[in-house]
Structures are given as C-alpha cells and as structure tokens.
C-alpha cells in the first residue's frame, strides 16, 4: 500500500476555518493581487483537499492530483458535502499525469508542502503548466519535540524537502520569483496508539523499519506534540 494511503485516515481534512499556513499565505497572495476567482487551477499533491476545497469555491474548475487513492476519497466525500461539482480527480503521480497531459494549461499551478515534484524535469513541467505558479514548501528543518528524539535514536532525521528543491532550480536557471517566509507552531494531541502509528509512519518514510515495541520507551501514554515549522511561499 502507498504510505500516503496509510496516512490518509489521520491526515488533516478540510475545515472552513483557515489554518495558520493558509491565513499567512492568502494574506501574502492578496498583496500580490493573486485572484482565484473563475480560474482554472491544478492542485498538485492535493491530499485530502485542505487547499483544494477552499480554492474550488472560487475557481472555475480545479484538477485535484494525488497518487494516494485514500486521500482523494476523503476529498471527494468532503466535496460532496460542500456540493462542489467543479473538481476533476486524478489518482496518479505528477510524472504519470504530465506524460498523458503534456499540452495541459491552467491559469494557476498550485502545490503545497508535497513531495510530488521529484527532479528538474518535474520542476520544468510545473513551470510550463501555468502563467502563475504558487509553491509552498519547507524553508528549514521542521522541529518536533516528539519525533526528533525518535529520529535521533534511529539515526535519521526529518526528510521534508528543503535543502534542494524548486527554489534551487529557479535560482540555477535565473527565474525571478517572489519569496515570503513565515513561521508556524502547532500543538497536536494524540492517543498513545496514534502517536506510535505516526512515529512508525515517519520512520517508514525514511526507510527505517521499526516495531511498536521499539517505540514503547518513547511513548508511555497519550502525548502532546509541539511542531515548529518555517514555511516558504514562492510565486513566479
């Protein structure tokens, strides 16, 4: 099973109240006069639709692309509740999709904290999709007072893409872009079993095989996790 399919059941879902990252991003996009109304949009690595469903309420149409079927099923369920009919669902990787849709054009190409773009070819294809490209990614190492000690014990680290990513490609190719960096701190409460499952998922993503028993020392009971992130918004 796709690891992101496993993550779907515990992944954040759409909420009409914007989260901190969304609030700060939309505020900055508004300053740049970016308008989503009546636009044709693609949301790459859309997940459960946390952004998709908000954008769809203004867009003419939106393509929701994700390689995790379970994520898209949640998105569809929430879209039905909101009676949104302008969403096209694509269950595949970005590379698979672009190979079948090489001439596709949108008003806005959007990606938020997703590993969907893997290499320079993907970056170039992302750029070619639309006149306006919006990219949200990690600006630095994401800190977690729960996961970091576990990562250290297993001799690994947070693997979110932030050292070499789309920004590196834009700089190498002298592509001008607007950059805005902001912080986000959130506190997540998890039951013991959920915390262990979350830690195992992150270790698995890093190629580390561990068991529930291996994590018993770190998770004595329910936990309260503080996550500190530095996010960057690129618009070009």
Residue ranges with predicted function:
Residues 159-174, 178-180:
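Short alpha-helix
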Residues 116-129:
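A short, conserved alpha-helix within the catalytic core of class I
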Residues 131-142:
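Conserved beta-strand signature within the Rossmann-like core of class I S-adenosyl-L-methionine
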Residues 1-35, 39-47:
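Conserved class I S-adenosyl-L-methionine
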Residues 48-96:
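Class I SAM-dependent methyltransferase SAM/SAH-binding core
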């Amino acid at each position: 099973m796709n690891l992101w399919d496993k993550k779907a059941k515990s992944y954040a879902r759409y909420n009409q109240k914007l989260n901190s990252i969304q609030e700060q991003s939309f505020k900055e996009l508004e300053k740049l006069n970016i308008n989503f109304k009546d636009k044709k949009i693609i949301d790459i690595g859309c997940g459960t639709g946390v952004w998709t469903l908000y954008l769809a309420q203004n867009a003419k149409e939106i393509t929701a692309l994700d390689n995790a079927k379970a994520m898209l099923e949640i998105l569809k369920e929430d879209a039905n509740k909101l009676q949104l009919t302008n969403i096209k669902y694509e269950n595949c990787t970005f590379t698979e999709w672009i190979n079948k849709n090489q001439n596709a054009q949108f008003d806005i190409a959007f990606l938020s904290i997703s590993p969907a773009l893997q290499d320079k070819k993907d970056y170039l294809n992302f750029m070619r999709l639309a006149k306006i490209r919006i990219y949200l990614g990690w600006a630095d190492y994401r800190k977690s007072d729960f996961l970091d000690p576990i990562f250290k014990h297993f001799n690994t680290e947070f693997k979110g893409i932030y050292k070499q990513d789309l920004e590196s490609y834009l700089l190498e190719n002298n592509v001008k872009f607007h950059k805005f960096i902001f912080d986000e701190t959130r506190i997540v409460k998890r039951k013991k079993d959920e915390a262990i499952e979350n830690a195992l998922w992150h270790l698995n993503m890093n190629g580390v095989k561990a068991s529930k028993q291996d994590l018993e020392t770190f998770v004595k009971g329910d936990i309260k996790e503080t996550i500190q992130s530095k996010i960057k918004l690129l618009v070009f």
